[in-house]
């Protein structure tokens, strides 16, 4: 799945609406129960793989089941909302950290509030 195949429509209230268009799946409005922008790519890949497996191996799974499960899944420790305006994310590499920061910036793009980031890493992870 390439970035040209999915598009974020709206990021609001802890959810993301997006579209996915490729040779295996076309949908103009999917919803994720997360403000984590990076999960759009992950879910797009998962949906596409499910559709491909369904087609190649004639797996009996409804498209609605694929979309509903992707849209309602909560990734614990990945942009997980603890309370209002407090999120935890287990990003463990530079790309993951940058994706988290991009998601936070997107959440606060239209706000006069400022985001604060508390970061911690174990020495063994450096």
What is the meaning of each model-derived region?
Residues 1-29:
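Extended acidic/charged loop-beta regions that coordinate divalent cations
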């Amino acid at each position: 799945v390439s970035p040209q195949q999915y598009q974020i429509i709206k990021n609001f209230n802890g959810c993301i609406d997006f579209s996915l268009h490729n040779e295996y799946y076309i949908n103009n409005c999917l919803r994720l129960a997360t403000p984590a922008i990076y999960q759009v790519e992950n879910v797009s890949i998962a949906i596409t793989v499910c559709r491909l497996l369904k087609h190649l191996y004639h797996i009996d799974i409804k498209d609605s089941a694929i979309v509903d499960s992707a849209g309602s899944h909560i990734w614990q420790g990945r942009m997980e909302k603890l309370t209002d305006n407090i999120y935890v994310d287990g990003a463990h590499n530079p790309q993951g950290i940058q994706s988290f920061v991009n998601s936070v910036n997107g959440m606060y793009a239209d706000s006069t509030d400022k985001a604060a980031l508390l970061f911690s890493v174990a020495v063994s992870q450096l």
